[in-house]
Amino acid sequence: MSEKKSQEKPCSDNNQIEDPSSRPEVQVPVNYVYRILQEEQYTPCIGSTTSDFLLAMLDYLTDYILEVVGSEANINNQQNISQDRERQRDNDREPSRGFKNAPFSLFDEMPGPRRNG
């Protein structure tokens, strides 16, 4: 147990200002941050108002990210639909080249049955 206590740093050591560019980027899942804030494991270091603020900020950022992703998906979907319509118009204008040499077309008469009766 004494090893664990010696490894933990008190909150007062966190007062040193660290250059953010010197730290490697850390990617932490939103659920993990939310759970930590809910469990209030860092209560001795941050006050309840700070915890509330961070939770509100996390909710706001999550909503914003979802809104941006949704609008991007809608824009991409609309672009794909307009491109599909342009392709369809181009295909309607020119007959298909693969069927030019076919001995029949879709509008020819249906041949009669081969057997009678």
Curated annotation (Swiss-Prot):
Q: Which Gene3D superfamilies match?
A: Histone, subunit A
Location of the region described as Disordered in the Swiss-Prot/TrEMBL record: 1-25, 74-117
Q: Please give the GO cellular component terms listed in this UniProt entry.
A: nucleosome
Q: Which segment of the chain is annotated as a signal peptide? A: none
Q: Name one GO molecular function term.
A: structural constituent of chromatin
Basic and acidic residues: which segments have biased composition? Answer: 1-11, 83-97
Superkingdom of the source? Eukaryota
Q: Which SUPFAM superfamilies match?
A: Histone-fold
Subunit and partners: May interact with the N-terminus of HD.
Would you tell me the protein name for this molecule?
Huntingtin-interacting protein M
What organism does this protein naturally occur in? Answer: Mus musculus (Mouse)
Organism lineage: Eukaryota, Metazoa, Chordata, Craniata, Vertebrata
